[in-house]
Each structure stands twice: as C-alpha cells, then as structure tokens.
C-alpha cells in the first residue's frame, strides 16, 4: 500500500451490458483486492426471469488487481464462478474484450464533472454523487430503450 497516494478510486460492478449494479469509493491507496467481496455483497437482487430474484451473480469478472486465491475461494463457496485474470500471466488473455464494458461505464461516469474531478472532502458526499451518477446512466439507458 502506498500511503502517500492522494485521491480516490471508483470500484464498479456492472452487468454484461454495462449497467451499473454497485459502486463504491475508496481512497487511492487501498488495494483493489480488498474491495472485491464487499462490492459483490453490494449488488442488489435483480429480477429477470419469472420467479424469485437473483441474489448473487453467476460469475464475477475482474482484472489482475482483483486476483487473490483467498477471494476466489470465498466466491466459489458462495456459488459464484470467479473469472479473474491471474497476476504474472502474460497479457493477451482476452479480458480486454470483456473489460471494455466496465471501462465504458466508468467513462460515462467521468463525463459528470463532480465525479471526474473530486471537489468533495467527505467520502460520503462523493459516494452519494457516484450513486446519483449510476442512476443517471440507468435512466439514460432506460429512456433510450423506451423513448
């Protein structure tokens, strides 16, 4: 952990279409791997097919920053398949093709000035604006589908 690193990071969980399901703000010097399980826990139940809503994703994809054998074991114990790039493996694994969905959603969030440049000193205020930004993205997608 680099204790001198300033700023904050946005951790984001999306569905396959890039719709934000959960978002979290942490300090820039926090390791990404420590936020994997809380981010998965923050995903709300999602309705889809008839019946009870899904309370957990079928699989979790992530880049090398989220790879850890202990976290993989926890996810498998919950019935979630971890599809995480391993540290030390050569590049070209094909994750970039899938990762662009999350990167595009992050880019949409950073189009909002309050999220691109952090002016808020308090984390809870910045987290609120991140949640509002996710709601704006969801509304725009819904409006585009129904409009």
Predicted regions located by residue number:
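Polybasic low-complexity intrinsically disordered regions
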Residues: 1-87, 133, 140
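Basic, amphipathic alpha-helical segments enriched in Lys/Arg and hydrophobic/aromatic residues
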Residues: 69-73, 77-79, 92-147
